[in-house]
Amino acid sequence: MNSKTKLIHCGRGDQNVEVRSVNPTLMRASTILFKDHATWQKYRELRKTDRVLSYGARGTTTNFELEKLICSLEGGYRAQLFPTGLAALAMVLLNYASKDAHFLITDAIYEPVRTICELFLEKMGVEIDFLKADASDVEEKIKPNTKLILCESPGSILYEIIDLPKLCKIAHSHNIPVAIDNTYSSGYFLNPLELGVDISVIAATKYLSGHSDVTMGVVVINEKEWKNFDKLPEALGFTTSPDDAYLVLRGMRTLDVRMKAHEKSADEIVEFLQTRKEIKTIFYPKLKTHPNHEIFMRDHKGANGMVTIEFAEGYSKEDAIKFVDELEYFSIGASWGGYESLATVTTPPRTATDWSKRGPFVRFHIGLEDTKDLIADLAKAFDSIKK
């Protein structure tokens, strides 16, 4: 089944009944009731292998339908919802954490992951090393006690690209699982499990929801690495609201048309940006000048609405701030993946690569507005800082 068809037909409840609603039922429940003790015990046993009703904190049928849809889209064995994307990443890290374990994390990883490492993992005795953003130095950084490689590709500021099949081949030769933050592609433009990745993490907050009104994360995992993932949310008290699950299900029905619209608009905006002398570098993976562009085009079905610019020499951070403040249709906000356009002055948080002497940078999320309006808005803002 094509991904476009999966988005419409998967995760819609029991399709074998004679009469049903087009959407799955929204089930809110903290307590699940059983007809007798034997039934209660039966479902407590079933939940070890299946997603069944057993306890509200472990999810309701609404949650399960969303998990089925995302799992089908990503081609995984199982999926597990979390209240935020960061919580999902934290669970992946905790699942492999132990005293004297060694983790490799790529430099473009979502910045708060570094805080998890500092506040929790290092105190537990986990050793952390950061790879180059493209993971090109992975082989030389692997140690006998390396238990996990966590990457993000493309990165969410400069869109660094990793050769995932190559990375996975190296990692698996050392029996090391590979996890990826796949939020950029959101299971639609890239299917990392097909390329050898073991665990895919998506912030459903962004494109899966698509309407900037939900926070949620999801872990999609292959059968080999599933192990205790289903126990982690309940053990640590993580649960996901069925109302939020319902909203993400609704958002995902239009994921295909939204992603294509974001990409088309981003293409048009990038074409305009290439005419501006105020810009030194445009970071957009579809550009032939983008590092590892060929790998991106080989593995991805498209690009999302993310574009970053680096201003030319002579422009200061203050100029970048004035530029962003002059924008009318680009709001200032830290997230992305919704229907609206955003612009933020940013600095790539890196340790393996030094970007401190580069910039200033502005990251855009190209929303679903008319691109003629967006281009006119950008032109006006550029003119306000013209040298």
Describe each PLM feature range.
Residues 118-119, 127-129, 315, 326, ...:
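PLP-dependent enzyme catalytic core of the Aspartate aminotransferase-like
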Residues 267-328, 334-337, 347-356:
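Conserved small-domain helix->loop->beta segment predominantly found in fold-type I
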Residues 11-14, 28-35, 206, 254, ...:
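Glycine-rich beta-alpha junction loops
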Residues 7-15, 78-278, 283:
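Conserved PLP-enzyme active-site core in the AAT-like
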Residues 1-27:
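Short conserved active-site loop signatures built around small residues
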Residues 50-52, 214-216, 302-306, 359-363:
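Short, solvent-exposed beta-strand edge segments and adjacent coil->beta transition regions
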Residues 36-87, 113-119:
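Conserved N-terminal alpha-helix of the aminotransferase class I/II PLP-enzyme fold
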Residues 248-257, 305-313, 362-367:
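Short, well-ordered beta-strand elements within core beta-sheets of diverse protein domains
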